[in-house]
Amino acid sequence: MPASLAGPPASGPLPLPPPVNYNPALLATAPAMIDGYALLGFDRLAGFPFAPVPFDPATAKPGAPPPSSADQIPATIKRFDHQLAIVTGFMLPTKMEKGLVTEFLLVRSPMMCCYGQVPNMNEWVVVQVPAGVKPLMDIPVSCFGKLHVKEEFDNGYITSIYQLDGEKLTDAKG
């Protein structure tokens, strides 16, 4: 069998290739600050390879914790955990109450939804806005709030590595 068809070596999976926009110098530099908020773009947040460790809770040993993929997140990104940040992207509402969006995915590209390409795990931020905001679809929006850099799981499946406690939302073009 050709080596290319043999699969990964017995020692583990092959390392992930860096993303197209991989820029180690950017990851190492401090972001611009606006009124105490770090300006964090997806060029930085998605600027490293990340792939969740495969795990199927349905076939795992009962009570087994899901494996962590946190070691793939660079320290230069983890340092933004619990920091005030501004992240700009496109709103994809996931929860609404009384006509207002209370939770949404902030995605890198408007093509990363229903009929577009599936984003990488580091190309979205789960934003919680308890008071709710009006839906702003198909235009870039800037979200202000406290960023969390940690794995979130739902029923054993990793669902995000970035979460933001939304304080304010603005139309990025206006």
Language model features: what each stretch is:
Residues 1-174:
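OB-fold and OB-like single-stranded nucleic-acid-recognition modules
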